[in-house]
Amino acid sequence: MPNSQKICIIGSGLTALTIAYLLSKFNLQIDIVEQDLKKKKIKPTKLALSKHSFDQLCSYGLKDIKKKSNVVKNIYLHDSYSSISLKKDLEFSAPNTKEALAYIIDGNILFSDISKKIKSFKNINFVKKEISSINDNKFYKEIIFKDLTKENYNLVIFASANNLFLLSKFKLRKVIDKLYNEDAYVFNLHHKKIINNSARQFFLKDGPLAFLPVSRTETSVIWSIKNN
C-alpha cells in the first residue's frame, strides 16, 4: 500500500538516485526534480564504500555490485611529510581474511545499476521542470515551478551540485561554507595483474596522496594538492 508521504529530491546524480532508491523501499511517493534529465555524465571516479554501506545496498536489491567491486582488506596510513616512505605508521585490517573493510567500485557502474532499478519503480517519478521558489508552510514544503505549477511535499532533499543557487531558496538555520584551497588530481593506473586489496594514504607536505585498489589490474590515485 502506497505511503501518503511525498518526498521531493532535487537533483538526478548518483547521490540523488541512491537516496531515492533507498527511500522507495518504504513505499514513499518520490519526485526526482531536475531541469535537465539528459543522460548524466558521471566523472570517472572510483568510490570507496564502507562494508556497512555496501551490505545495505546489497540487501536492498543491488547484489550484482558485489562482482563489480573490489575488496579492501587492509588500509595503511603513512606519515610521509618530507618524502614518500613505505613505513606504516597506522594499519587497519579486516578481522579475518574472508571479511572486508571496504569496497571500491566505479561510480558510473553504480549509477547505471541504480538507474535501471529505479526505472521500474512506480512510486518514483522524474520531473523535468525548473524550480522558481520553495516556500516553507507549517505542514509541508511548497515548490513553485517556472511554469507556475505547484507541488506540496512533506520533505525536500537537496542533492544537486548543478543547482547550487537553489540553496538560497531554502530557509536553512545554518550554512557551513568551507574553502579548502585545494585541487584534487585523479589518475587511474592500469598495470599487470597483482594481488590488489590494500589501500594506502600518504600524508605529504603538499597534501594527502591516496592509492585505491580498483581491481587486480587497476589502481586509482587521488592527490589533493594545496593551491599555493
Regions found by a protein language model. Give the residues of each.
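N-terminal Rossmann-fold NAD(P) dinucleotide-binding loop
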Residues: 16-17
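Rossmann-fold NAD(P)-dependent oxidoreductase module
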Residues: 22, 117, 188
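Conserved N-terminal helical subregion
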Residues: 70-169, 178-182
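Extreme N-terminal starter segment of soluble prokaryotic enzymes
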Residues: 2-7
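Conserved FAD-binding catalytic core of PHBH/FMO-like flavoproteins
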Residues: 159-228
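Glycine-rich FAD pyrophosphate-binding loop
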Residues: 8-10, 22-45
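N-terminal FAD cofactor-binding segment of flavoenzymes
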Residues: 43-80
